[in-house]
From Swiss-Prot:
Keywords: Lyase
A Pfam cross-reference name: D-Glu_cyclase
S-S pairs: none
NCBIfam families: PRK05463.1
GO molecular function terms listed in the Swiss-Prot or TrEMBL record: lyase activity
Protein name, as recorded: Putative hydro-lyase blr2921
Record EC number: 4.2.1.-
Protein family: Belongs to the D-glutamate cyclase family.
Top-level class of the enzyme under EC nomenclature: lyase
């Protein structure tokens, strides 16, 4: 008797959208990560020499609105398995900033050549996570509509100081009609690990913003006559304090071009 055995083909499942994004950036693709890999948490990067890690950790504890820690590496390791099994901090961000003595000296798409054995990576929550919740409620988000980076501004809101780290909070801005602004407060309050509720609504000059059409980071977006600007604490704040602290060396992401993780946005909600 002849027994025919059907060949079984094992299909390799498609990688997660978050991993697909990281692989694309690892391969050299560059662009804003707003709206990329819907449903997955994105993070801001602050990579510092170990001698400054304790003080920066304390700075984040004192300033949880702009600096909510969602991941931290071991000294010298470019991997944070809790955020992605194959994630490589050195290659998986669209664009980085390399800092020396508080100034940006390079903006590469790969920092392998800059990597050192004494570096510690902090990954901080990003407002792109709560944007998904806003979109699910049918609320328009201007910078996504216009395919530009979210506008970000240095303010006169002082951060708590820790070691060499001190300076003003950076905020991101999204314009909404007043009723939608109230709803945005309610929705984003559920996401304290990704900046939570806004820190300010309305009059930009009250928090030290002289011209809303000229953001310090990102791209300007129009605010209609029937809208108000709504400001959230922003994970670019560490870049402002790194500049002020004049650290001899540091690496961050380029504003608006984040680390895409395998964490789910829904896990960031508290209620």
């Amino acid at each position: 008797m002849t027994v025919l055995v059907a060949a079984q083909q094992t299909e390799t499942p498609d990688p997660l959208p978050s991993r697909q994004a990281r692989l694309a950036y690892r391969g050299g693709e560059v662009g804003s990560t707003a709206g990329v890999a819907p449903g997955f948490v994105q993070g801001n990067l602050a990579i510092l020499p170990a001698e400054y890690a304790s003080a920066f950790h304390r700075f984040c504890q004192l300033n949880p609105k702009p600096c909510p820690i969602i991941g931290m590496s071991d000294v010298g390791s470019p991997h944070i398995p809790a955020l992605g099994a194959d994630l490589d901090i050195r290659t998986d961000v669209p664009r980085y900033r390399v800092w020396r003595d508080g100034e940006v000296v390079d903006e590469p798409t790969d920092v392998t050549g800059y990597w050192r054995d004494d570096l510690v990576t902090f990954v901080l929550g990003c407002s792109f996570s709560f944007e998904e919740a806003l979109l699910d409620e049918g609320m328009p988000i201007r910078h996504i509509e216009q395919n530009v980076r979210v506008p970000m501004y240095r303010t006169n809101i002082a951060c708590g100081e820790a070691g060499p780290f001190a300076g003003p909070m950076v905020v991101s801005m999204r314009p909404f009609k007043p009723a939608d602004a109230i709803r945005a407060v309610q929705i984003t309050s559920r996401y304290p690990a990704v900046h939570g509720a806004p820190v300010h609504l309305g009059h930009p000059h009250l928090i030290g913003i002289k011209d809303i059409a000229k953001p310090d980071y990102g791209d300007p977006v129009p605010v209609a006559d029937d809208e108000i600007p709504v400001f959230w604490a922003c994970g670019v704040t560490p870049q402002s304090v790194i500049n002020a602290a004049r650290l001899p060396f540091a690496i961050t992401h380029s504003p608006g071009l984040m680390l895409v993780t395998d964490l789910k946005n829904r896990t960031m909600a508290v209620i």
